[in-house]
């Protein structure tokens, strides 16, 4: 079996950039890597992503939102993640089940027990071995995210970025609560600095965690920046 790593964080935290940098280091070292994301990651789930992230769809209810995420995840796990792990690849996923707990649970206030049950059903109990939480103040993350959106041509995925500061603070608190509850799986990295600063912190955090997991080869790959 392969090794499953997820990257999590609030809007604009820099997780997508750090995931890409890790992919490049792994591939340069000869590792086989599958990079994917949620919502989306495959054609069926990408159609649901378009609905979920389009600001024009502000009428989506919290429950409908939750169920769309679960449906997209069920397809994504079976079509992309499980096959890649069975091929022995390292899977890097931009958001996974923790995002649903943070956004729909802590942010929207939906029942956490229901979310846990849906996540278990959608994933077939597939869970990451390691989750990298890129944490930064809400104001910093939103400033970056909105600047990125304004610079983007074509369809803008901005429904969550347009939520209130209070919503995003609840999401951040939800992530930090998860990290405290599952310290054996989470590493928390300060993402308030620039890309290089954050990258160095990610590399060192991964090196230490991989060594503790007995993944010496992967630890050596991830230490470079």
Swiss-Prot record:
GO biological-process terms attached to the record: dTDP biosynthetic process; dTTP biosynthetic process; dUDP biosynthetic process
EC number: 2.7.4.9
Domain of life: Bacteria
Protein name: Thymidylate kinase
PANTHER family, alphabetized: THYMIDYLATE KINASE, UMP-CMP KINASE 2, MITOCHONDRIAL
One GO term describing the cellular component: cytosol
NCBIfam families to which the protein is assigned, alphabetical: DTMP_kinase
Catalyzed reactions: dTMP + ATP = dTDP + ADP
Family: Belongs to the thymidylate kinase family.
Organism of provenance: Citrifermentans bemidjiense (strain ATCC BAA-1014 / DSM 16622 / JCM 12645 / Bem)
Function, in words: Phosphorylation of dTMP to form dTDP in both de novo and salvage pathways of dTTP synthesis.
Annotated binding of ATP, by residue: 9-16
Keywords of the record: ATP-binding, Kinase, Nucleotide biosynthesis, Nucleotide-binding, Transferase
GO MF terms, alphabetically ordered: ATP binding; dTMP kinase activity
């Amino acid at each position: 079996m392969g090794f499953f790593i997820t990257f999590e964080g609030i809007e604009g935290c820099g997780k997508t950039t750090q995931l890409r940098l890790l992919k490049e280091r792994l591939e340069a070292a000869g590792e086989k890597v599958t990079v994917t994301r949620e919502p989306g990651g495959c054609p069926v789930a990408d159609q649901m992503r378009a609905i979920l992230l389009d600001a024009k769809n502000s009428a989506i209810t919290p429950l409908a939102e939750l169920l769309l995420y679960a449906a997209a995840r069920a397809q994504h796990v079976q079509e992309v993640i499980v096959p890649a792990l069975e091929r022995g690849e390292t899977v890097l996923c931009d958001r996974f089940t923790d995002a649903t707990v943070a956004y729909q649970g802590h942010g929207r206030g939906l029942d956490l027990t229901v979310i846990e049950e849906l996540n278990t059903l959608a994933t077939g109990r597939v869970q990451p071995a390691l989750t990298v939480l890129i944490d930064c103040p809400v104001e910093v993350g939103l400033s970056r995210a909105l600047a990125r959106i304004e610079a983007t041509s074509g369809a803008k995925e901005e429904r969550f970025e347009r939520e209130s500061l209070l919503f995003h603070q609840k999401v951040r608190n939800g992530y930090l609560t998860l990290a405290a509850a599952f310290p054996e799986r989470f590493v928390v990295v300060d993402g308030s600095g620039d890309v290089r600063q954050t990258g160095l912190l990610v590399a060192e955090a991964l090196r230490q965690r991989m060594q503790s997991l007995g993944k010496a080869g992967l630890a050596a790959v991830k230490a470079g920046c």
